Amino acid sequence: MAESTVRKGHQKPLTSEVALRGKKLEHGDGEVVIIGGMVLDIHATPSVRANSGTTVPGKVYYVRGGVARNVAECMSKLGAKPFMISAIGFDMAGNLLLNQWKSAGLSAEVGILKDKDIETPVVCNLFDINGEVAAGVASVEALEKYLTPDWILHFRNSLPSAPVLMVDANLSHPALEAACKMAADMECPVWFEPVSVTKARRISFVVEYVTFVSPNEDELIAMANALSGCDEFQPLKESQKKNISVMSLFQLLKPAIWVLLENGIEMVLVTVGSNGVFLCNKGGPRHFKKHTEKINRTGFGGQLYKAFMQKNPPSRSSGISELNKSSHLFAVHFPSLAASVVRLTGAGDCLVGGILTSICAGLDIMQSVSVGIAVAKAAVEAEANVPNTFNLSAIAEDAKSAYSGAKVLFHQSML
């Protein structure tokens, strides 16, 4: 088991400042800017085990999806008002997405390109009887064709006041680069959502601009290989993960995580299914701090902040000595929460949506990840990618469980 540097009498708070490239992540009157896909998901779920070559009874649902859209909808239902940049058509799928977007009180007048020539992105997923994706077909070419650098740059004036820009990897290489360079010019931190194993490799085009990434295990491996320039890392086999301890799983993923941190990414958030989440940075607990003097705690964001702080102490002593060295990998493990699983597809997006909303409400990164895990729990218990409503009290209570269960997993030199 890896040693952590713990000395009694020299304890430092684990949760305070998040050091971000360019500027501190603060919230005034700005909105999170989100660029990426608005997609209609078709979910086919058999009621018995599916057989090749024939149909089986089950249910087929039309679900509003797309990583960026899911994150934005989640944030809106948590009280934030993100600014969305995307593209859809005037077809059935586009109308379904647009009508829901307007009903959520979000603006569709600017940011979302609408054109009769656009075929709205559609993804069809076939699930197994356990709720896991068994196979899928994605028709999302319109995102690369119509979400162009020119369209994105129309909205550069939205970034100066934005606390963060989130991009999903559905964007083409030129569009990703344009968005991230635009953010860098405005000193706006960038959150990169990898979307899929194939598209996760697009991190190599923009890594110098990225502050946060949120891959799952397989996406992490793909990103590390893309940044290494070779297939140095192999995806974990199911046999490797069977009955494995959290520490052993982290040790398997640690070299890939370090590649991302060595390439300048400041925070790596790895989702590991039922094993929870790893939050990793390069340095130590000092880099988990965040100034909150200018946070605007009004509206629902203020309620979220108050609800969390009532359930949890304002700071937690971790017993970690202050080894702020660039050669040190610092990792915290958050456990998953027990849930009555209906569907797993929206969990990761709601995790990110919960984290972003919480940061903007004034919670630090540890607290925000705890809220994100609570929001993800609510997502897996719903049929839709994003639940119709969130219960603030339940979110705060579940966040308390995630927060109290967080443990420092690793704090050691990588030299």
Regions found by a protein language model. Name each.
Residues 59-60, 85-90, 107-120, 193-195, ...:
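Beta-strand->loop->alpha-helix junctions that form or flank phosphate-binding loops
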